[in-house]
UniProtKB/Swiss-Prot annotation:
This is Cytochrome b559 subunit beta. Its main location: membrane. GO terms for cellular component: photosystem II reaction center; plasma membrane-derived thylakoid membrane. One of its GO terms (molecular function) is heme binding. SUPFAM superfamilies: Cytochrome b559 subunits. It comes from Synechococcus sp. (strain JA-3-3Ab) (Cyanobacteria bacterium Yellowstone A-Prime). The keyword Cell membrane does not apply. This b-type cytochrome is tightly associated with the reaction center of photosystem II (PSII). PSII is a light-driven water:plastoquinone oxidoreductase that uses light energy to abstract electrons from H(2)O, generating O(2) and a proton gradient subsequently used for ATP formation. It consists of a core antenna complex that captures photons, and an electron transfer chain that converts photonic excitation into a charge separation. Heterodimer of an alpha subunit and a beta subunit. PSII is composed of 1 copy each of membrane proteins PsbA, PsbB, PsbC, PsbD, PsbE, PsbF, PsbH, PsbI, PsbJ, PsbK, PsbL, PsbM, PsbT, PsbX, PsbY, PsbZ, Psb30/Ycf12, peripheral proteins PsbO, CyanoQ (PsbQ), PsbU, PsbV and a large number of cofactors. It forms dimeric complexes. Heme binds at H26. Pfam families: Cytochrom_B559. Belongs to the PsbE/PsbF family. It is a single-pass membrane protein. The gene is psbF. It comes from the Bacteria.
Length: 47
């Protein structure tokens, strides 16, 4: 049986904010949102 470190249920688990996963997600997500916004804005440019 795998033993797990037992926490008290009322004690919150500390999750670090800056992780490798967080950096990987945001380095992809931030430019993606920027480009989607730029492409959406281009649709309204009249020539």
């Amino acid at each position: 049986m795998a033993t797990k470190s037992v926490n008290k249920p009322d004690e919150p688990v500390f999750y670090p904010v800056f992780t490798v996963r967080w950096l990987a997600v945001h380095t992809l997500a931030i430019p993606t949102v920027f480009f989607l916004g730029a492409i959406a804005a281009m649709q309204f440019i009249q020539r």
